[in-house]
Amino acid sequence: MKPGAERRLLQAALALCCLSPLGFGLKGMIAGPAMVGGGESGADLISHYRYLSGLFFGLGLVLASCVPRIEARTRRLRWAAGAVVLGGLARLGGLAMGDAPSLAHHIALAAELGLTPLLVLWQARIARPPAA
C-alpha cells in the first residue's frame, strides 16, 4: 500500500474510533446514568457520571485532533491512548471482581485493550519516514 493511502486509512480508522467517546460522552453528559438504564440514582452519582462523560467527550476531542496530521501527533496520540488503555484495565479489573456488564461493554473492553494499542503501533509506522 502506498504511504499516502495507508495514512488516509489510519486517519479514517481513528476518526471512526473517535465516534465512540464523542457520542457516548455527549449522551452521558445529557442523559446522565439514565443512558444505561437502571433505577433511581442519587444526585452525587448523576453529577459524577456527567463529569466522567465530559472527560470521555474531551478524550474524544483530543483523539480527533490527532486525525488531520496523524503522522506528527505521536505524543498526543500515545497519551490519549494510554488513558483509554487505563480505562480498559479498570473495566477488566471490575470484570475480574465479578462485575457482569453487557455485551456492549465487553466489546468496548476489546477495543480499549486490543484496538487502541494497534492504532498506536500503526501510527508509529506512519510517523516513521520510509527507508531510502
Q: Which role fits each region the language model picked out?
A:
Residues M1-S20:
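Cytosolic juxtamembrane helix and N-cap/initiation of the first transmembrane helix
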Residues L19, G23-K27, L45-V67, G82-L86:
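Core segments of alpha-helical transmembrane spans in multipass integral membrane proteins
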Residues L26, L63-A64, R91-G93, P117:
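Alpha-helical transmembrane segments of multipass membrane proteins
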Residues L26-V36:
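Short membrane-interface helical motifs at transmembrane helix boundaries
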Residues G39-I46, A100-A111:
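Non-cytosolic membrane-interface motifs at loop->transmembrane helix junctions
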Residues A72-A83:
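Membrane-interfacial loop-to-transmembrane alpha-helix junctions, especially the N-terminal start
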Residues L89-H106, A124:
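Membrane-helix boundary connector in multi-pass membrane proteins
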Residues G114-A132:
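Membrane-water interface at the C-terminal end of transmembrane alpha helices
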